[in-house]
């Protein structure tokens, strides 16, 4: 956080608790306390930024490791013949940028692939993997993603069934669990590591990831920097791209569904600030002027969509969690009364203020050994056990679990959820309210993230002017991180030590050479 912002917010919050004006604090008093905290090492000051010590250490160590990897000599592989054979056998024709992304993965030990939905990222990954298998039959490959749903989707789309979550692949718990952990973990044995949805990775997770990569391993980071940034501290993916030291390939040609996907085109338009969207059966807008009316329309549309496609393929995504009839929590209660009404007390269980029923659609809200935060499933039974109620859950094939009452605190109803919670997931159909009441939350990246969760159909319900407002609002709140600047600083230091020309110096040499 910026020093000035921190001091102003601290002064405001503290003085709100002091009813007598004469006793209220002055700005200089807050500044003096902050300076004392800096001198004691309770916070870290870098330029105009104030860090918690652990966050500064994470940013600094991650920057140092990335810079060392960028300076580390990479042995470019000659893949031309293998690549041509793979393309022929897979029956794919790569665009020039897709081919550049494949080559970058073999010319550098760290590279980035970005692009909106439908631009062929999956085809590139499948090609990279197949080339690698041909070049290194005994090489170890690891695919990872921040969420369970994203890792399973990665496995399905690439045909590589060993994709894991970053937490699982790195053997992590939560950041809170990590505070007391002192044992240094061994580097991963993988020779090629591909991480999808990297825009979701925060500073803590990035620190853990880069600390576990062995020398010589190739890393490919894949993601969409125009989606919402990570929930936790940092803006890692954007900083890696903007530092201009990591090779980045931007895929911008739409391929999905033979170029017939309105979702892919409209995602591109929204990203460009263009309000002239295409509408049709797979991208619909239904007008509604208020939350109560919108909620009725959402419920009606939801019932129609689940009848057509199945309840596990349709998701309502709301900008708001709890405020108003079109918020995720209130929609959950209303929809449940329609699609899964009360039958008997034996089929219900109350956990605090939450009530769950047999056949409810639910979401896991915490990582465990068997399920990940954001995983969706259904309640299959509620029964009496020796030590209280037992609840049977179905999270998909091979992931049928039984929870105790204590475990149930990590579940939410999930007929509807927030756009933030949907990050890393995909659904056949997405239904999304867009109302004036949601204006405070609606920015271009939130809208873009919501519609790009859908594979086949988007249904927007609300006010057109709110949709246009969201498309035009691109004032993304700045995250005060210096990761990119620190990568640049360490890279220059390591490059000079190794006698490697810096990028700008290399450009000057080429210019002088004619």
Residue ranges and their predicted role:
Residues 225-370, 380-382, 511-512:
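Conserved helicase motor core of P-loop NTPases
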Residues 105, 116, 146, 319:
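P-loop (Walker A) phosphate-binding loop of NTP-binding proteins
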Residues 120:
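Conserved glycine(s) of the Walker
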Residues 107-113:
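Pre-Walker A (Motif I) flank of P-loop NTPase domains
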Residues 16, 21-78:
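Interdomain "pre-motor" coupling segment immediately N-terminal to P-loop NTPase/helicase cores
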Residues 375-514:
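C-terminal accessory regions
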Residues 92-107:
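N-terminal pre-P-loop "Q-motif" helix
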Residues 112, 123, 127, 131, ...:
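Conserved helicase motor core of SF1/SF2 NTP-dependent helicases
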């Amino acid at each position: 956080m910026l020093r000035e912002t921190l001091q102003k917010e601290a002064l405001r919050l503290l003085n709100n608790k002091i009813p007598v004006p004469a006793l209220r604090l002055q700005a200089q008093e807050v500044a003096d306390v902050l300076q004392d905290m800096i001198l004691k090492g309770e916070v870290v000051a870098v330029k105009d930024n104030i860090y918690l010590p652990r966050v500064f250490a994470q940013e600094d160590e991650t920057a140092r490791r990335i810079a060392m990897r960028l300076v580390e000599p990479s042995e470019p592989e000659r893949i031309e013949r293998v690549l041509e054979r793979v393309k022929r056998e897979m029956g794919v024709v790569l665009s020039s940028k897709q081919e550049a992304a494949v080559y970058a993965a073999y010319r550098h030990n760290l590279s980035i692939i970005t692009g909106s939905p439908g631009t062929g990222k999956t085809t590139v990954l499948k090609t990279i993997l197949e080339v690698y298998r041909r070049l290194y039959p005994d090489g170890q490959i690891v695919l990872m993603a921040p969420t369970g749903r994203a890792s399973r989707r990665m496995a399905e789309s690439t045909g590589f069934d060993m994709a894991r979550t970053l937490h699982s692949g790195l053997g992590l718990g939560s950041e809170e669990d990590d505070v007391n952990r002192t044992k240094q973990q061994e580097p991963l044995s993988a020779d090629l590591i591909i991480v999808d949805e990297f825009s979701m990775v925060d500073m803590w997770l990035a620190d853990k990831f880069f600390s576990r990569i062995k020398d010589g391993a190739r890393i490919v980071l894949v993601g969409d920097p125009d989606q919402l940034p990570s929930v936790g501290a940092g803006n890692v993916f954007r900083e890696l791209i903007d530092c201009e030291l990591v090779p980045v390939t931007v895929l911008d040609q739409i391929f999905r569904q033979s170029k017939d996907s309105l979702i892919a085109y409209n995602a591109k338009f929204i990203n460009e600030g263009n309000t002239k969207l295409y509408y049709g059966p797979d991208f619909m807008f239904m007008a509604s002027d208020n939350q109560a009316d919108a909620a009725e329309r959402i419920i009606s549309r939801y019932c129609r969509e689940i009848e057509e496609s199945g309840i596990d393929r349709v998701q309502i995504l709301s900008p708001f969690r709890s405020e108003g009839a079109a918020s995720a929590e209130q929609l959950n209660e209303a929809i449940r009364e329609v699609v899964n009404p009360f039958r008997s007390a034996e089929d219900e269980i109350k956990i605090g203020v939450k009530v769950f029923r047999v056949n409810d659609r639910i979401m896991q809200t915490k990582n465990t050994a068997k399920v990940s935060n954001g995983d969706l499933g259904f309640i299959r039974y509620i029964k009496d056990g020796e030590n209280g109620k037992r609840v049977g859950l179905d999270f998909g094939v091979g992931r049928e679990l039984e929870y105790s009452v204590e475990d149930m605190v990590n579940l939410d109803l999930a007929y509807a959820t927030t756009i933030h919670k949907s990050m890393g997931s995909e659904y056949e159909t997405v239904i999304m309210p867009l109302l004036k009441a949601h204006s405070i939350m609606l920015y271009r990246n939130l809208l873009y993230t919501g519609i790009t969760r859908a594979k086949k159909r988007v249904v927007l319900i609300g006010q057109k002017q709110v949709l246009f407002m969201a498309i035009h609002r691109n004032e993304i709140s700045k995250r005060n991180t210096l990761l990119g600047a620190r990568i640049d600083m360490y890279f220059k230091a390591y490059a000079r030590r190794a006698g490697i020309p810096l990028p700008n110096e290399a450009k000057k040499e080429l210019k002088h050479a004619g």
